[in-house]
């Protein structure tokens, strides 16, 4: 299986494109959904509370607030959760070894050095204005966290420069589908 990593800035359209690929029958993996599942595990919750005692109780909102305002807390959580995420990603790749392609959405792919797990990387991008419009429609939107995420992540330009392919999600659906079709043609040549 050719492993394709999908990355991009916050609200750039990564999940939309991943879901589109899943609808087309491709195997997909979403890091954010995987982490949400891990957070449901009581043993994971217990470990996080031990690592971050300032939380007092397990609450996703409090975790977000803490890790985006405290570099040490973010590093502790990442050092704990990333190995679990890598295990799930490796399992996804093993379970889908007979598929031609597997797409995995990893928001912090470069920042977390996950690019080494992929044969090909795609960056999804759009204008800052469009990203902000998308972000404010989310129920969990918080402008302070949005700005902290922007500080932590590599710039869109850096992600595009590092990627093997880039998709502009700030276009109409027809143009977006054409870009995805081109991506499939490009990666099919790698087989």
Swiss-Prot record:
Keywords: ATP-binding, Coenzyme A biosynthesis, Cytoplasm, Kinase, Nucleotide-binding, Transferase
GO-annotated biological processes: coenzyme A biosynthetic process
Statement: the UniProt record of this protein carries the keyword Transferase: yes
Main enzyme class: transferase
InterPro entries in the record: Depp_CoAkinase, P-loop_NTPase
Record GO terms (molecular function): ATP binding; dephospho-CoA kinase activity
CDD domains: DPCK
Pfam short name (any one): CoaE
Gene Ontology cellular component list: cytoplasm
Domain DPCK: 3-191
Protein name (record): Dephospho-CoA kinase
Organism: Rickettsia felis (strain ATCC VR-1525 / URRWXCal2)
Gene: coaE
């Amino acid at each position: 299986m050719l492993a394709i990593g999908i990355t991009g800035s916050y609200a750039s359209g990564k999940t939309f494109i991943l879901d589109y690929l899943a609808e087309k029958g491709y195997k997909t993996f979403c890091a954010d959904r995987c982490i949400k599942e891990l957070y449901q595990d009581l043993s994971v919750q217990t470990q996080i509370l031990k690592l971050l005692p300032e939380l007092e109780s397990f609450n996703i909102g409090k975790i977000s607030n803490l890790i985006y305002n405290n570099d040490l807390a973010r590093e502790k959580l990442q050092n704990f959760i990333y190995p679990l995420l890598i295990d799930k990603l490796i399992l996804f790749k093993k379970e889908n070894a007979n598929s031609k392609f597997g797409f995995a959405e990893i928001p912090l792919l470069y920042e977390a050095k996950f690019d080494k797990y992929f044969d090909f990387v795609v960056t999804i991008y759009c204008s800052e204005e469009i990203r902000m419009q998308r972000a404010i429609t989310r129920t969990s939107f918080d402008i302070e966290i949005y700005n902290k995420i922007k500080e932590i992540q590599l710039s869109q330009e850096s992600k595009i420069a590092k990627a093997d392919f880039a998709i502009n999600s700030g276009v109409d659906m027809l143009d977006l589908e054409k870009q995805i079709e081109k991506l499939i043609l490009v990666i099919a040549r790698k087989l």
